[in-house]
A protein has these predicted regions:
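ATP/NTP phosphate-donor binding region
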Residues: 1-91, 347
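C-terminal charged capping/lid subdomain of soluble metabolic enzymes
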Residues: 313-389
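Fold-independent oxyanion-binding glycine-rich loops
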Residues: 16-17, 37-39, 68, 95-97, ...
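A glycine/threonine-rich phosphate-anchoring loop and its flanking beta-alpha core
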Residues: 10, 20, 113-210, 304, ...
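Glycine/serine-rich anion-binding loops at beta->alpha junctions
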Residues: 89-105, 139-145, 277-280
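Short Gly/Thr/Asp-enriched flexible loops that form oxyanion-binding sites at enzyme active sites
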Residues: 51, 78-81, 100-114, 147-148
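Active-site segments that bind and position negatively charged phosphate/pyrophosphate groups
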Residues: 203, 207-332
């Protein structure tokens, strides 16, 4: 196992009836709060009123920024930065899913610099050395942004969707109440589950063979998704299902499973190009890509990892031929994503045309070949897009 540093000091309030602690946590950082959220869902489920009550009881001054988009835009980040600077905001409170939290992270960072927040991204990205404190209330189990140092922002003007990692982006406190996800519809529950699964598979499929502890941890999380995602779809107010998905979402991407693993992610840079141009749901794009990426990477040098995955996650008979186990593991992954979760199978089903495949492949490899489970060139990425067609 390679050396690594693990430092995720986010304080988590998990479970029902935890919002009573919101006021005291915010007051640790100041009294001027920027409340950020997306559309009207937090108002429809009564969460908005609950949050405002807690904030007013704490005696803080509240400023609001609503309308943060799925695949959040740099324009929303800029507006948040403007409010932070003009109103001398002390702490940001993001209420929503990963899009709201991601946008809020870069508002918090942008408030501490003079340059445009888009300069945090790209090949010549400026450093993120500090950010205003961030507190989150999670309403969707998917991205894990509530407990990680990352965020992804879209720029429609340039046609880019880019991610960034930086320790100051880590939320100080996150409230994870599974009941707040009861109202999430089947489609978003399915997309969120696919997103969580991809976060794990991106790390799990690795050529290092000395990470038994981390591999078994990841296999447990994968089995959790396979078990509880269908339950959440059938019984949206099943607390155990929602709780297991929510906690798995956080641990899938908070840095723990990365310990000692050095390979780059493969499906995420490819998917970012799909949603940058076509604005599809991130988890859906990952679902379409993942089985084809797995199929493309399968050969005699990688087959053992598929065997481990198929036997330990899906219970495939270990006595079968190795290549047959590998192929069956891919088939079962696709069956879970497309049949069990009910997500679309192909890019053409969601309106993505071959005409942009080459351009998207080039942009996915903007920093060079993707050095993941198997190194992917522009041509490789284009081939995977074609397999998804």
């Amino acid at each position: 196992m390679n050396s690594f540093i693990y430092n995720i000091p986010t304080k988590v309030y998990f479970g029902e009836n935890q919002l009573g602690n919101l006021g005291k946590e915010l007051l640790k950082f100041g009294k001027r709060v920027l409340l950020t959220y997306g559309g009207g869902s937090i108002k429809r489920i009564g969460l908005y009123d609950r949050v405002l009550t807690e904030l007013h009881n704490a005696g803080v001054e509240v400023f609001e920024l609503s309308g943060i988009e799925p695949n959040p835009r740099i324009e929303s980040v800029r507006e948040g930065v403007k409010i932070c600077k003009e109103q001398n905001i002390d702490v940001l409170l993001a209420v929503g899913g990963g899009s709201t939290i991601d946008a809020t992270k870069f508002m918090a960072a942008g408030a501490c610099v003079e340059h445009d927040p888009w300069e945090f991204f790209g090949a010549n990205a400026k450093p993120i050395e500090r950010a205003l404190p961030i507190v989150t209330i999670l309403t969707l189990a998917a991205t894990g942004s509530e407990m990680d140092t990352a965020g992804v922002i879209s720029n429609l003007e340039t046609g880019d969707k880019l991610g960034r990692l930086a320790q100051p982006l880590l939320p100080k406190v996150s409230f994870l109440d599974p009941t707040l996800t009861y109202s999430v519809n089947k489609y978003q529950t399915a997309c969120g589950s696919a997103d969580i699964m991809s976060h794990i598979l991106e790390v799990y499929f690795n050529t290092q063979e000395d990470l038994y502890m981390l591999d078994t941890f990841m296999e447990g999380m994968l089995k959790t998704i396979v078990k509880f995602a269908p339950v959440a779809l059938a019984e949206p107010e099943n607390y155990e299902a929602r709780a297991n998905l929510m906690w798995t979402s956080s641990w899938a991407i908070n840095g723990f499973i990365n310990g000692g693993k050095r390979k780059a992610w493969s499906c995420h840079p490819m998917e970012h190009e799909l949603s940058a141009i076509y604005d599809i749901t991130h988890g859906l794009g990952l679902a379409i890509l993942t089985p084809r990426w797995m199929e493309y990477c399968l050969d005699e040098t990688t087959v053992d990892k598929y065997v481990q995955y198929g036997v330990n996650v899906f219970g495939i008979d270990a006595k079968m031929d190795k290549m047959e186990i590998a192929k069956e593991s891919i088939r079962l992954t696709a069956e879970f994503l497309f049949d069990t979760l009910g997500l679309q199978r192909t890019l053409s089903e969601v309106g993505i045309k071959r005409e942009n495949f080459h351009t998207m492949a080039q942009k996915a490899c903007r920093y060079g070949d993707i050095k993941g489970f198997k190194t992917l060139t522009v041509k490789d990425v284009e081939c995977i897009f074609e397999m998804c067609e």
